[in-house]
Amino acid sequence: MFASIVGAISNFMYSYLLIVMLVAVGLYYTLRTRLVQLRMFKETIRVILEKPVGADAVSSFQALMVSTASRVGTGNIIGISTAICLGGYGAVFWMWVMAIVGGASAFIESTLAQIYKKRGEHGSYGGPAYYIEAALGSRALAVIFSIALIATYGVGFNMLCAYNLQSTFIAYSFYNEATTPWVIGGILAVLVGYCLFGGGRRVIAATSTLVPIMGVIYISVAFVLTLINIDQLPAVLGKIFSQAFDFQAIFSGFAGSCVMFGIKRGLYSNEAGVGSAPNAAAAADVSHPVKQGLVQMLSVFIDTLLICTATAFMCMTSGVEPVKELAGAPYVQTALAASMGGVAKVFITVSMVLFAFTTLLGNLYYVDNCFAYIMKAVPGPTFNMVYRAIACVVIFIGAGSSMGLMWDLADVLMGCMAIINLPVICILGGPALKAMDDYSKQREAGKNPVFVAKSIGITQKLDYWQK
């Protein structure tokens, strides 16, 4: 009953609300920024290659490479394979479309996060909650957004992540549908709890080191296997474009169409316009907000157009046909096995264990920040203990739940964030657009752009950009 209700809400949100909002806002800012995705692409590369500001500082290029490698996970691997199995080859095309138009939305929201960021003891912080309160003057809406983010990352994404991790074990003979998910969920919950309650520093350090390495290995394997099966690529591309524009199939069952799955899984992977990336963008130390807007825009392209496409091509050129029964980890494992043999399932399992574990901890970091915003202070030890215990229980339950429910729940909660953030960035886009023009003028004058809020008409007192 609950699963069917959540599924119906998800279908309604993405069939009638989010598809219009995501495309409309993306196209709107693509036009308002005068195709910033293409026009400033060369400048984006220049920003990425800028030297760090200090001897101990991390360069933009290093930060981007580490974050990109670390983002290879459930969204890029299992999310894309699920989209292909349930939505067909055409889902890949609509995933590309959402990444391209979504890049403009990502540029705006991350630039806003930089403009309105706050000064903290250990650097800057911010995100949608902060620009909603500072620029719109609505703490109530900011709190609602924070609650939506807590629900999305602390519940929806972590439950889905736990499910996706345990689903990689389906390929093994010892897997028992009734017991194995709960056993794996229990082990995962204990490990996460061990790290959350003050221990596990070595575990966190080890996984943080291994994840970027495994990310690079995964991307390399995906490209190599695609090259091995390069003769299949023309046929695959033909299916992608033909199915993407099979309008009879699309509109006869829109909720299950390639458009819908392309949008859902693309959004889950790159999060453009959702309002999560600005939380990380606000922490960057740059001379001009637009620099971080460009970096986050490029991150969307790398995440979807590069990494997700690598997964899609690796699977689709393998000769293994995507069917509903293989949705999720089994399709990736079966596709890899066609070229790598039995080692494929072990490779995917090890990859997902590392990716999922760090994702679970990273998601809870976002949650911590939102609780701090809502409570106007860092939560006390008793609150943290209760919340972290609940977080572990949520992970355990997620591992033993059904695939359909977990994806639908994550989609609905993520959609709630987007429904709040997209109208907000439409209302507040003015300062970001003015900042972009200010940046362009300084670059045309041969300067390294330095932002001063008053230069674009922002008169309110900000923690940064005063002079």
Language-model segments: which ranges?
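Extracellular/periplasmic helix-exit of transmembrane alpha-helices
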Residues: 30, 107-117, 121, 223-239, ...
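N-terminal alpha-helical transmembrane segments of multi-pass membrane transport
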Residues: 1-74, 84-91, 102, 426-467
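Extracellular loop-to-transmembrane helix junctions
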Residues: 7-43, 85-123, 302-310, 345, ...
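Flexible loop linkers connecting adjacent transmembrane helices
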Residues: 35-60, 82-84, 88-92, 104-136, ...
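Membrane-interface loop-to-helix entry segments
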Residues: 21-28, 32-45, 164-169, 180-228, ...
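Alpha-helical membrane segments and immediately flanking helix-loop junctions
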Residues: 54-86, 112-115, 121-129, 133, ...
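Helix-loop-helix module between adjacent transmembrane segments
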Residues: 25-30, 98-122, 128-129, 133-163, ...
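Transmembrane helix-loop junctions in multi-pass membrane proteins
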Residues: 2, 32-37, 76-80, 89, ...
